[in-house]
Swiss-Prot record:
Mg(2+) binds at residues 191, 193-194. GO terms for cellular component: chloroplast. The record marks 324 as: Transition state stabilizer. GO terms for biological process: photorespiration; reductive pentose-phosphate cycle. The basic functional RuBisCO is composed of a large chain homodimer in a 'head-to-tail' conformation. In form I RuBisCO this homodimer is arranged in a barrel-like tetramer with the small subunits forming a tetrameric 'cap' on each end of the 'barrel'. Its cofactor is Mg(2+). This is Ribulose bisphosphate carboxylase large chain. The gene is rbcL. RuBisCO catalyzes two reactions: the carboxylation of D-ribulose 1,5-bisphosphate, the primary event in carbon dioxide fixation, as well as the oxidative fragmentation of the pentose substrate in the photorespiration process. Both reactions occur simultaneously and in competition at the same active site.
């Protein structure tokens, strides 16, 4: 008879409320804001269609394949409480729609085209359920939390870091000097800022050499293993690998990548190189707020965090809850658990739409960084626990006596908080008291307490449910 040409409603094909999801399906939760007059079922079905097999009209080649096998299905829709004309649309995608081991392909399919769709006023991807059948096709983090602790020989406490400031303008020699002072004072890591790549005032090779010198000198003096996140991000993938190879030849423990500006393809390749060559990989999330800050449009950071765990990274920045950068406590802890734990139970109060089973994929250390100082230490220790990296840039380098005393202040504050917690004290209630007690026998900490006693960044978090 031929096929029936013409345009038909998406919901006739792609809205299937009686569908039972399979254990191998990738499940997505979208926050959909339809245009006026578009029913939510049609909007949800349109999302399922445009992010899987559908197009705007019936095509004769539909008859050459099994749509039932390959189409995305919108299987449930619920209104968002307290919001007008917003719905959560749940979509199930058959696994065969995706290339194995490619975050790039997964995102191109699920969010590649549909966000510009005219029938929608706005669209946000809130969460993804990655089935083990798919996550098992990824290497994941180069090493993971336990292997990193074993490499560094550091247990039972969060790790301490510091971003070297001013982020741009220092010569390589002075930069290395700042690194040495911080590491000598008691930090575990120092860090290249995300936009430190290879600029005219400091070429990458010079920076790598002076930082390596600083690391070895500080290790010799303190007897502890030290590291500096050498930013390998570059304009081409070949150049990035060249920098990672040089870092490996210097014998340093860790390199760094800006995974959103660098891209998932480059990130996954770098993660593979890092595992094969014993390098840890620190991930910075520069550009994330462009994608995740709007409440009704874009992609929530928990999805970007899951994608990073699949693509590969040993550390990733994840907000502070208490500093100058974004993060509501329950929601932040939700995606922190998604980064660290093997199995995470569905919990809508924390923004977790699906239970996620990572099976044996290594975990990622969350990094708390941005506007934090010694007075925040009890809260950070309590909120993030041992498996985290606490990074104080200005909170180290802004110390009135210099970098090394700034590092000493942070290390003393951290050790005091960990000891108090281990003795059963309540960090949330007694935090200030614990810091004050410790500062009595640490002049460096006392000076830091004095400088930052009044600093607060008091704005409400945007990232609410």
């Amino acid at each position: 008879v031929g096929f029936k040409a013409g345009v038909k409603d998406y919901k006739l094909t792609y809205y299937t409320p009686d569908y039972e999801t399979k254990a191998t399906d990738i499940l997505a939760a979208f926050r959909v804001t339809p245009q006026p007059g578009v029913p939510p079922e049609e909007a949800g079905a349109a999302v399922a269609a445009e992010s899987s097999t559908g197009t705007w009209t019936t095509v004769w080649t539909d008859g050459l394949t099994s749509l039932d096998r390959y189409k995305g299905r919108c299987y449930h829709i619920e209104p968002v409480a307290g919001e007008e004309n917003q719905y959560i649309a749940y979509v199930a995608y058959p696994l065969d729609l995706f290339e194995e081991g490619s975050v790039t392909n997964m995102f191109t399919s699920i969010v590649g085209n549909v966000f510009g769709f005219k029938a929608l006023r706005a669209l946000r991807l809130e969460d993804l359920r990655i089935p083990p059948a798919y996550s098992k096709t990824f290497q994941g983090p180069p090493h993971g939390i336990q292997v990193e602790r074993d490499k560094l020989n550091k247990y039972g406490r969060p790790l301490l870091g510091c971003t070297i400031k001013p982020k741009l303008g220092l010569s390589a020699k002075n930069y290395g000097r700042a690194v040495y002072e911080c590491l000598r004072g008691g930090l575990d890591f120092t860090k290249d800022d995300e936009n430190v790549n290879s600029q005219p005032f400091m070429r990458w090779r010079d920076r790598f050499l002076f930082c390596a010198e600083a690391i070895y000198k500080a290790q010799a003096e303190t007897g502890e293993i030290k590291g500096h996140y050498l930013n390998a991000t570059a304009g081409t993938w070949e150049e990035m690998i060249k920098r990672a190879v040089f870092a490996r030849e210097l014998g340093v423990p860790i390199v760094m990548h800006d995974y959103l500006t660098g891209g998932f393809t480059a990130n996954t390749s770098l993660a593979h190189y890092c595992r094969d060559n014993g390098l840890l990989l620190h991930i910075h999330r520069a550009m994330h707020a462009v994608i995740d800050r709007q409440k009704n449009h874009g992609i929530h950071f928990r999805v970007l965090a899951k994608a990073l765990r699949m693509s590969g990274g040993d550390h990733i920045h994840a907000g502070t809850v208490v500093g100058k950068l974004e993060g509501e406590r329950d929601i932040t802890l939700g995606f922190v658990d998604l980064l660290r734990e093997d199995y995470i139970e569905q919990d809508r109060t924390r923004g977790i739409y699906f239970s996620q089973d990572w099976v044996s994929l290594p975990g990622v250390l969350p990094v708390a960084s941005g506007g934090i100082h010694v007075w925040h230490m009890p809260a950070l220790t309590e909120i993030f626990g041992d498996d985290s990296v606490l990074q104080f840039g200005g909170g180290t380098l802004g110390h009135p006596w210099g970098n090394a005393p700034g590092a000493v202040a942070n290390r003393v504050a951290l050790e005091a908080c960990v000891q108090a917690r281990n003795e059963g004290r309540d960090l949330a209630r007694e935090g200030n008291e614990i810091i004050r007690e410790a500062s009595k026998w640490s002049p460096e900490l006392a000076a830091a307490c004095e400088v930052w006693k009044e600093i607060k960044f008091e704005f409400p978090a945007m990232d609410t449910l």
